[in-house]
């Protein structure tokens, strides 16, 4: 398919599912700050006036889960019931147990980096040369819109913006290359007092036209701003929120593939998270090295076993050397045992809260170690010897 439209979406930090992700990762970070060896599988549910934190956590850290949850809600901006939630008055229920001893046996640390994977599963990493961050344009722009919208809200540019919001961007491809943005959808929660026309003008002029580079938008680009008309009831009052329910927003916006495992609330012994980060690291370095224009990497694990059961590279026909050579180069350059991933990407740190909103990939912050192009030369050298 050469000529087509492709759409991705993102959601703001005030979306109830993203609130849940941020609370789960806030708790993970609080534990890792005290106990880097803590085992965390933390799930969060939000509904009207209530936060429920559940899961399996084994740690020596002393963390006030309720306090962490309230701090996250406060930082997002839910500080009054008329916004759909209030960190001061919401209930917080804690239902946390310890990690199963059967799982713990499989992931115990050894001196030889042969710590077993925390579960079976398959993980994907993807990269494409459409943006400087080597991410698909549709998801990169979707994230930028809701992130910039939150910045406008927190800067008090207007007094009627509320935390809950969604974005959606449709990109037109010609001969497989992104050419223009065909449509932009923005739905933002707002105060009841503001008119639809005021919302539409502000979002068009202060958000869309300032956030998206002008070369992507033309006179035919369609803008849909709060297309239902009103969006007053939002946050957990409008919809329940749950950790791990925005896995496509978290990754590549529907491009590439997804193995099904969520990220937030999981320590790096869970390959759902660490191996997905490693797969992105591989794919980004392949594309960054100019070895392919587009790349998808799959890895898979058996619980309690360190070495992946499979590694697969798909170059979509954009590589001169082919996927088999790329796969051999990956095996030479990258150690995909979970303990090595954790060490190589320095994952036993409280670095996860920023990942829980606006995407885990395509970010420039220093703590996003899986975004570094630090294996480019090694991959090039490996390909030379193999081709």
From Swiss-Prot:
Name recorded for this polypeptide: S-adenosylmethionine synthase
Pfam families noted in UniProt: S-AdoMet_synt_C, S-AdoMet_synt_M, S-AdoMet_synt_N
Cofactor notes: Binds 2 divalent ions per subunit.
GO cellular component term, pick one: cytoplasm
Molecular function terms, GO-annotated: ATP binding; magnesium ion binding; methionine adenosyltransferase activity
UniProt-listed PROSITE patterns: ADOMET_SYNTHASE_1, ADOMET_SYNTHASE_2
GO biological process: one-carbon metabolic process; S-adenosylmethionine biosynthetic process
NCBIfam families found in the cross-reference section: metK
Family indicated by similarity: Belongs to the AdoMet synthase family.
Assembly, per entry: Homotetramer; dimer of dimers.
Cofactor (UniProt): Mg(2+); K(+)
Superkingdom of the source species: Bacteria
Pathways involved: Amino-acid biosynthesis; S-adenosyl-L-methionine biosynthesis; S-adenosyl-L-methionine from L-methionine: step 1/1
Functional description taken from the UniProt entry: Catalyzes the formation of S-adenosylmethionine (AdoMet) from methionine and ATP. The overall synthetic reaction is composed of two sequential steps, AdoMet formation and the subsequent tripolyphosphate hydrolysis which occurs prior to release of AdoMet from the enzyme.
HAMAP family with a match to the protein in the record: S_AdoMet_synth1
Residues the record lists as binding ATP: 15, 164-166, 230-231, 239, 245-246, 262, 266
Primary localisation category: cytoplasm
Classification via SUPFAM superfamilies: S-adenosylmethionine synthetase
E.C. numbers: 2.5.1.6
Binding-site positions, Mg(2+): 17
Subcellular location: Cytoplasm
Residues the entry annotates as binding L-methionine: 56, 99, 239, 270
Catalytic activity, reaction form: L-methionine + ATP + H2O = S-adenosyl-L-methionine + phosphate + diphosphate
Presence of the UniProt keyword Phosphoprotein in the record: no
Keyword field: ATP-binding, Cytoplasm, Magnesium, Metal-binding, Nucleotide-binding, One-carbon metabolism, Potassium, Transferase
Disulphide bond pairs: none
């Amino acid at each position: 398919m050469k000529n087509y439209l492709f759409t991705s979406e993102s959601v703001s930090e005030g979306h109830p599912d993203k609130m849940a992700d941020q609370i789960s990762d806030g708790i993970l970070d609080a534990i890792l700050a005290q106990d880097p060896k803590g085992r965390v599988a933390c799930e969060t549910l939000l509904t009207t006036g209530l936060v429920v934190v559940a899961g399996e956590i084994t740690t020596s850290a002393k963390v006030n889960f309720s306090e962490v949850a309230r701090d996250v809600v406060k930082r997002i901006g839910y500080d009054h019931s008329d916004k759909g939630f209030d960190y001061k008055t919401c209930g917080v229920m804690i239902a946390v147990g310890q990690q199963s001893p059967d799982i713990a046996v499989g992931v115990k640390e050894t001196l030889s980096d042969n710590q077993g994977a925390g579960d079976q599963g398959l993980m994907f990493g993807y990269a494409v040369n459409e943006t400087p961050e080597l991410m698909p344009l549709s998801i990169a722009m979707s994230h930028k819109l809701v992130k910039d919208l939150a910045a406008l809200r927190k800067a008090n540019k207007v007094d009627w913006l509320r935390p809950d919001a969604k974005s959606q961007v449709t990109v037109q491809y010609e001969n497989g290359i992104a050419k223009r943005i065909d449509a932009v959808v923005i739905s933002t929660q707002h105060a009841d007092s503001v008119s639809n026309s005021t919302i539409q003008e502000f979002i068009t002029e202060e958000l869309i036209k300032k956030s998206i580079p002008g070369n992507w938008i033309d006179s035919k680009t369609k803008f849909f701003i709060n297309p239902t008309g009103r969006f007053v009831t939002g946050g957990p009052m409008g919809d329940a929120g749950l950790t791990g329910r925005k896995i496509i927003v978290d990754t590549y916006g529907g491009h590439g593939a997804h193995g099904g495992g969520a990220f937030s609330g999981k320590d790096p012994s869970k390959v759902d998270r660490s191996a997905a980060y490693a797969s992105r690291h591989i794919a980004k370095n392949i594309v960054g090295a100019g070895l392919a224009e587009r790349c998808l990497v799959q890895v898979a694990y058996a619980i309690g076993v360190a070495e992946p059961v499979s590694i697969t590279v798909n170059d979509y026909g954009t590589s001169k050397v082919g996927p088999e050579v790329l796969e051999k180069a990956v095996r030479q350059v990258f150690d995909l045992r979970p303990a090595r991933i954790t060490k190589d990407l320095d994952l036993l740190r409280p670095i996860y809260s920023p990942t829980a909103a606006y995407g885990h990939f395509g970010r420039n912050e220093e703590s996003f170690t899986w975004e570094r192009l630090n294996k480019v030369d090694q991959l090039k050298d490996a390909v030379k010897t193999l081709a």
